[in-house]
Amino acid sequence: MISDIRKDAEVRMEKCVEAFKTQISKVRTGRASPSLLDGIVVEYYGTPTPLRQLASVTVEDSRTLKINVFDRSMGPAVEKAIMASDLGLNPSSAGTDIRVPLPPLTEERRKDLTKIVRGEAEQARVAVRNVRRDANDKVKALLKDKAISEDDDRRSQEEVQKMTDAAIKKVDAALADKEAELMQF
């Protein structure tokens, strides 16, 4: 019983950490990364379709992404979708490819992005703590039903706290890495 609760809590905490890492990977840094365009959706014959299903995105150099659209007639629609996104990018057609130069980040924009990333980190920490609370509540319910002893309850809470501390350390480490990446010139 208790081991199931602990395993469930551990899996859920790990999912919180992974969701945070995925979220901050979408925040633009000074370097080009294909994942930057993951959230872009293009109207493909009346159907909203993710860009990665319509084209391949590669890094041409440290500040330029190259998009090779599979259906050449979709080039203008892809450009329009990139411009409509809130990424502040201006794509340009070059024959069969679309190039997306990444403008350098200003100091002010770097600070704004750092604030956003810190907010995401706090949300991840809160999510991890909520998982801890749920696990502890389930264990307390077992104690109340006299299915476990007080020693088991205390031991379980200590283990859940250790898992919580480990998950929060992972969030903090990912946050520190992203902040360092954002502040590089």
UniProtKB/Swiss-Prot annotation:
Swiss-Prot/TrEMBL keywords: Cytoplasm, Protein biosynthesis
A single GO cellular-component term on record: cytoplasm
GO biological process: cytoplasmic translational termination; translation
Coiled coil: none
Annotated protein name in UniProt: Ribosome-recycling factor
HAMAP family cross-referenced by the UniProt entry: RRF
PANTHER family: MITOCHONDRIAL RIBOSOME RECYCLING FACTOR PSEUDO 1, RIBOSOME RECYCLING FACTOR
Organism ancestry: Bacteria, Pseudomonadati, Pseudomonadota, Gammaproteobacteria, Enterobacterales
